[in-house]
C-alpha cells in the first residue's frame, strides 16, 4: 500500500494538499490519533474495497502525535508499505497573514497569540521536519501550483514545478528586500562610484561591468558564490521549494550589485535554470 503522510504547520496548505490527493483517488483521513493508525492500516488492508493509496493528515492537533509518530512510521515501513512524509511549511509572515484573513485562532497553543502558536508548533515539529521525504514551502504558491506540486510528488517527481530563482540587485541604503531567501553583500568589491567617468553609468553598462570584473577579488568571489549556489539550488528543489529569492546588495544598488547580478543571471540562464532578474534600486538617487 502507498501511504502519504501530510503534516507540517497550521495554515501551510495541508487541506489543499488533501483535496489534491482525493482527486487522484487517495483514501484520505484527517487528524487520526497516532494510537489508531496501525489498526486503521490493518483494517484497510483487509477491507473488501480495493484501496491502494492512503493519505493521512497527522499534526500537532493530536496530542500524542509528537511522541508516537516515529514508532508508527517505522511500523508501516516494516510492514512493507511505501511511506512518504510531506511536510508543509511557510514563512511566519505568510502564516500570520493567512490566520488574519481567516480570523482563526492558532490550534497549537490554547490562549496564545498566532505568532506564539507558530513558534511553538515549529519547535514541536522540528524533528519530523528533518525526516520528511519532501519539505514544501507554500509561501509563494497559489492553490493551483500547490495541487500540481503535490500530484507531481506522488507520481514520483513527474510534473513537479521547476523552482524559479528570482535574482535581484539592491542598495543597502534603501533597505533589505524583505522577501529575500539569500542575501549577498558585495560592498567589499572595488566601487565604480568613485571613478568620475563611470559614476553616471550603471552595472548594465559595459565600462562599469569591466571595471568591477577586472579585479582579482571579484573573479575569485564570483567563482565561490556560483559554486555555492550550484550546491544549494538542487537542495532547495528537493525540499519542494518553488521560489527562491537571491538578493545582491551594494551601497546604492546601481553599480556593483547590478554588475554581479548580471554575471550570475547570464551564467545560470546558460545552464537552463529558471531565473529572472530585477534591479530594484538602479534608478534611485539619480536626481
From Swiss-Prot:
Keywords associated with the record: ATP-binding, GTP-binding, Nucleotide-binding
Binding locations of ATP: 8-15
GO MF: ATP binding; GTP binding
Listed Pfam families: PapZ_C, RapZ-like_N
Keyword Transmembrane helix attributed: no
Positions bound to GTP: 59-62
Annotated function: Displays ATPase and GTPase activities.
Assigned protein family: Belongs to the RapZ-like family.
Protein name: Nucleotide-binding protein GM21_3387
Protein source organism: Geobacter sp. (strain M21)
Organism phylogeny: Bacteria, Pseudomonadati, Thermodesulfobacteriota, Desulfuromonadia, Geobacterales
